[in-house]
Amino acid sequence: MADPSSSGRSSTTITDLDMDTLTRCASYLSIQDISNMAVSCKILNRVAYSDSVWQSFFRQEWQNVAPLWPNGSNQSSSMREAYLFRHTALRQFKYVDPLFRHIPTVGKRPHQILFDKNTILFSQGQSIRSLHIDDLIDGNISVANRGNHKARVTCMRLFSLNDTYLYQSDSGRDDNILVTSSSDHFIRLWSKGGSRCFKGHNAPVLTLSDKLLGDDTGKCFASGGEDGTVRLWSINCTGKRGQQALKATLYGHENVVSLMSVAGHKTSLLVSISNNGKVRIWDTTTASSCIRSSCCVGMTSVPIAPVGMKCHESLLYVAAGTSVTAIDLRTMNRAFTIVQKSKIHSFEFLPSKYSLCTGGTDSALLWDMRRVSDTLKVEPKAELEGHVGHVVTGGPDDLFVNVWESDSGAQTNSLICSAPDMGGCSAMAVDGCRIVTAGDDDRVNAVLRFRDFKTATCHVSSLV
């Protein structure tokens, strides 16, 4: 039986509202919500593409910045195009007037840098140091010492507290914890509550897993080092010097364990590589210190002295010698190999662009993974020239970090990272439209250079 109170009422839907009302309501939504609206129906598609909605987004994101349209013309372009043009250009550093801060530091050049939301973390010798970005923007340059190892820091990783039981309140779920390894044989976990020490390796610890392993009930991370072992550590356990945190010691490598990565299709699988090119895959759900090598579920080999590796979905990419080899972790068969003429010194995988980049002696090469097969010889889609020396993080002998478009390989900018006649770039980190580089200031001091392009207004095209 119909509800009497509803009799006589007319049926009204969202599409009965006028365009002005809809666009005003849409201005309170996120860009993701607007994208969902665009595919729902024709009327909401018109709202999602309206200039008033995107003008609101533009003003919220970049106050006091005038819109710039592609090709410098605003006659036929929409505000949506202006927003997307600036959003993309900022992340490609296509501006010449970013907010810039010169940060001198006493001692050795930083060799690892991480962005932790609004904080910059970097290692300098045996020390872990930090900078608050809000202070930098306000012009207050103050480097804080987070803590120290007893020898050089070899690896730094950030893991989300949401994946652990270490947060004290719901507000802390979105925070990160820092895990570092060192030549002093120790691993340290740094959080707001202090630090914890993990002891187990008998030699310098060189590498840490790039992600946490396991499910919600038992998250752990892995480490590898010069003692040839892979060790699994519980992220949640406590105890003196971390003895209770050591879950398992995995044996099987006969050489230094230099790299490791967690499989993309199964978070319980860990891939480790030693300096002699031996690759081992471990199922960490069956790991036990009581049974040696029992959880090794696959082995293969690549050229010696690998310089980089990355797991994506079910494939493992390993750069070593003059080649990058892709291995299917489900079958342990080689999917394909790409080869370049010069030795590879650095490697980075860009899954969103189906691309990988290899750094050689005097240039970098950009490869399109969609064109790769094991039967055809593949040429790089772009050669990124302009560097001097080995392309590692810009080049240790190059004063500049060069910026390239990942689609075309076109150079978009060049950023100085070191003083003239000094060494080149020793480390760098990128977070959206922010970049930090490390280099030399003089013969005694190192320098960090921080650039934030968010408020930049002078596009590189205006200088042509």
Language model regions located:
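Structural hallmark of WD40 beta-propellers
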Residues: 34, 117-121, 163-179, 195-196, ...
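WD40-repeat beta-propellers
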Residues: 128-134, 187-191, 230-234, 279-283, ...
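Intrinsically disordered, low-complexity acidic/Ser/Thr/Pro-rich linker and tail segments
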Residues: 2-15, 19-27, 31-152, 162-168, ...
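Loop/turn-rich, solvent-exposed surfaces of beta-rich toroidal or solenoidal domains
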Residues: 385-404
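Canonical WD40 repeat/beta-propeller blade segments in eukaryotic WD-repeat proteins
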Residues: 107-113, 150-170, 203-213, 254-263, ...
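Terminal intrinsically disordered, low-complexity extensions flanking WD-repeat/beta-propeller proteins
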Residues: 3, 22, 398-399, 407-464
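Conserved strand-to-loop turn within each blade of WD40 beta-propeller repeats
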Residues: 123-125, 181-184, 224-227, 273-276, ...
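Short C-terminal beta-strands that terminate individual repeats in beta-propeller domains
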Residues: 101-104, 142-148, 195-201, 240-242, ...
